Every structure is written in structure tokens, then in C-alpha cells.
Amino acid sequence: MLRIDNLDKRYKTGDLALKGVSLHIGAGDIVGLIGPSGAGKSTLIRCVNRLVPPTGGSIRLGDTELTRLGGADLRRARRRIGMIFQEFALIERLTVMENVLSGRLGYVGFWASWFRRFPQADVQRAFALLARVGLSDQVDKRADALSGGQRQRVGIARALAQDPELLLIDEPTASLDPKTSRQVMRLITELCAERRLAAIVNIHDVALAQMFLPRIVGLRAGEVVYDGPASGLTPDVLTSIYGEEDWSKTSDDVEIVDAAPRAADLSAPLKLDPALARL
């Protein structure tokens, strides 16, 4: 599905952000990316979607070599990659529905996107996604009126509206409280399982990574120093990733509460007001 081989990234300053990184991720696999600040986690994610050009190595999404693409070919490849950001990256003045539909911009023509006129099928899908993430009652609310957890759910729905094969998720809980963080992580893992989506989750919270992510990749100074199950994150392994620390307890025995009701299935027909198709 996603194959990264011997990936390097050296910035113009001479700093080597990634050194010989190799990862193979299958369909439906969700991988947690952990490591100290400056380890190269965000750089790796940005190399995959080509926001940052790698210096060397290979990144293949299916049969497509991403490192050689440019222009229209790169734009088409990016349709297959959904992004979920730490700071949500919503358009504040637009409604929840309009933000989710922005995930379809790569599939509609210029004028349709300019006037935000989306096909009815896209509107139906957006309604179903918002129901799935627990926001069916917030459709017409502006993004700047939402809580942090609600904003991240909009970001998740927008990424899924692209119908991606791969999700790149950069610090999805950094701006959230502990309870909301657990709810968001559970939602992400459930959605990936339902759709057999591959995902890379850059996450700073080791406890959350252990709770929700079956496979963990540890980066230190741009190199992979651990790639294995979450259960293998022993104190010695964590020390090799982060340095000396008291790792006697990295996760709490907590009850995970999922506030996102499992509502409309994407395949279920929805009755729409015709005016909604002209959003």
C-alpha cells in the first residue's frame, strides 16, 4: 500500500531531518509515530504528501512513485491522501457542511468549487460523514463557533470526504483535553478499521499511542530506532527513543468514552432538501 525505502531529507541549512527511513504499511494498517521534538516525525509526514520534497529515497503509494510527481499528476495523487492537522485547518467563516465539502474540491471543476456547487452525491456523503462523527446537529454552524473536539471531528470528516486510501494525521490531540483526546483517537481508529484505511499518526502522547495504536514506529534524530507492537514499548525501548526518563508508568487505566454515535452508514440513502445540493 505505502512503501517508504531509504528516505532522506536534508534541509538547505545542512540539517539532516531524515536518514534512511524505511516503512511498509498495508491497507488497513494504522501506525503511530513517536519520538522527541526534532526527531523528524512531521517531516516524514510532509514528505509523504510532498509538502516537503525528500532529498533521496523512494515513496510508493500503491504503484505510484510519489517522489517523481509534479503538477497535475501530483494533484491527482494527493486526492488519495487525506490529512488531519493539529490545528484543524478549517475555514473559520464557513459552515461545518462547507468545510467538509471542501474535501471534494479536487474532484469538481473550477467554477463549481468557486461557487461551492457540489453534486448531490457529495452532499449526501458529507451528511453521512457528519452523522458518523457525531455532528449531524451542527451542519449549519460556523467553524469558529465549535469546540476543539468538534473542530477536530470536522477535520476528520473532511479528510474522509476525499475518499482517500491513506490518512496522514499530525498531532490530532495536541490541542485537546485528555477525555476528548481519547474520544478522537477512538474515532480515528474505528473509522480506519471500517474503511480499511492505512494511516500514519504522529502523536506526542505515548500513553495514547499505547492505548489505541497497534504498531509503533519510534524516531530519534531522523532514524527509525523502533518498529513493532505497542506492547513492545518497554522502558528500555522508550529510553532508546527519548533518552533517560522514568518510564515505569506511561499509561493510565482509564475508561474510554466515545461520544460519537454510530449513526448513518455511508451506504444508507438520505432524504435531502433539493436546496442543499446547491451548497
UniProtKB/Swiss-Prot annotation:
Keywords: ATP-binding, Cell inner membrane, Cell membrane, Membrane, Nucleotide-binding, Phosphonate transport, Translocase, Transport
Catalytic activity from the UniProt record: phosphonate(out) + ATP + H2O = phosphonate(in) + ADP + phosphate + H(+)
Compartment(s): Cell inner membrane
Claim: Transferase is one of the keywords in the record: no
Alphabetical list of InterPro entries matching this protein: AAA+_ATPase (IPR003593), ABC_transporter-like_ATP-bd (IPR003439), ABC_transporter-like_CS (IPR017871), ABC_transpr_PhnC (IPR012693), MetN_ABC_transporter-like (IPR050086), P-loop_NTPase (IPR027417)
Domain of life assignment: Bacteria
Annotated GO MF terms: ABC-type phosphonate transporter activity; ATP binding; ATP hydrolysis activity
Coiled-coil residue spans: none
Principal EC category: translocase
Membrane topology: Peripheral membrane protein
The keyword Transport is annotated on this UniProt entry: yes
SMART domains named among the record's database cross-references: AAA
Family annotation (NCBIfam families): ABC_phnC
The family this protein is said to belong to: Belongs to the ABC transporter superfamily. Phosphonates importer (TC 3.A.1.9.1) family.
Subunit structure: The complex is composed of two ATP-binding proteins (PhnC), two transmembrane proteins (PhnE) and a solute-binding protein (PhnD).
Protein name per its UniProtKB record: Phosphonates import ATP-binding protein PhnC 1
Organism: Rhodopseudomonas palustris (strain BisA53)
Gene name, Swiss-Prot/TrEMBL: phnC1
